[in-house]
């Protein structure tokens, strides 16, 4: 059903509305343009922060060439060689040369996300102009004891969209390493949902540090980057990629739990005899498999 509403406006009213709308877009376009300019300028002069260890320079060169040629590279290197900096540094150089728009650093563990944050911080001390955000799971960002994502239950969800643009604009003008703690500080200040805020911030930074799920899991992946029709020139650094195999199995596997089937059966017992019988059949199959 299509419903039409007719609203009559004067030319002056339309002009005022249009100029206000354009002003909002222009300030973001101006930010993105100048941010990319300053980022690329800083990358031209960026030097590796330490003397190269054995094998580090060869690794960095291989990473840069792979990204410039839009290929894939699998790296197996001993612990302690400095793989994080040796892959992040050439990836940033590749972005500076126009071989990518955004860097995704993917990890399986919280501790390795901290290593990536530290690598960016070290390079910023060398003059790097580069903003990054660490995406944290919703339940670890939520201010409530139990996440309830609706305006009636959560004061941060109520009016979120009225305040989030100003919140994003301020944080990307004041911060470079946008970690969980930084997000919580600004989310509290502006009274916005920290998780949704974090996702919106990701659209206006150059690097994203996150779990594998946000790229590979079909249910969790970031739709703004990976939905059908979404396009972008992205560079992916997958830390400890051997962990991706079992994680991918989990992402693409369904799970049925016997206790849940029995709980559902109890709920519908007096309401749907047919569904109750079907659930009982499922329960019997579980019992047969258990034998």
What are these regions (language model features)?
Residues 11, 49-53, 81:
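Conserved phosphate/pyrophosphate-binding and hydrolysis machinery centered on Walker-type P-loop NTPases
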């Amino acid at each position: 059903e299509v419903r039409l509403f007719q609203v009559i406006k004067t030319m002056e009213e339309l002009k005022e509305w249009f100029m206000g709308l354009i002003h909002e877009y222009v300030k973001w376009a101006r930010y993105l343009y100048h941010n990319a300019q300053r980022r690329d300028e800083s990358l031209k002069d960026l030097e590796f922060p330490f003397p190269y260890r054995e094998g580090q320079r060869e690794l960095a060169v291989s990473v840069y060439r792979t990204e410039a040629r839009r290929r894939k590279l699998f790296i197996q290197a001993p612990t302690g060689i400095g793989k994080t900096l040796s892959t992040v540094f050439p990836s940033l150089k590749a972005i500076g040369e126009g071989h990518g728009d955004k860097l995704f650093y993917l990890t399986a563990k919280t501790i390795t996300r901290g290593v990536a944050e530290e690598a960016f911080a070290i390079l910023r001390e060398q003059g790097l102009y580069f903003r990054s955000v660490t995406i944290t799971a919703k339940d670890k960002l939520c201010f409530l004891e139990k996440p309830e994502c609706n305006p009636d239950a959560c004061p941060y969800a109520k009016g979120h969209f009225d305040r989030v643009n100003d919140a994003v604009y301020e944080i990307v003008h004041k911060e470079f390493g946008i970690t969980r703690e930084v997000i919580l500080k600004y989310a509290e200040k502006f009274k916005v949902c920290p998780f949704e805020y974090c996702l919106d911030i990701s659209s206006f930074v150059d690097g994203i540090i996150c779990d594998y799920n946000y790229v590979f899991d079909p249910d969790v992946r970031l739709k703004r980057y990976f939905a059908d029709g979404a396009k972008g020139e992205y560079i992916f650094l997958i830390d400890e990629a051997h962990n991706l195999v079992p994680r991918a199995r989990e992402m693409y596997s369904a799970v049925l739990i016997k206790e849940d089937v029995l709980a559902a059966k109890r709920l519908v017992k007096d309401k749907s005899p047919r569904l109750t019988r079907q659930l009982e059949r499922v329960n019997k199959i579980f019992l047969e498999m258990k034998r």
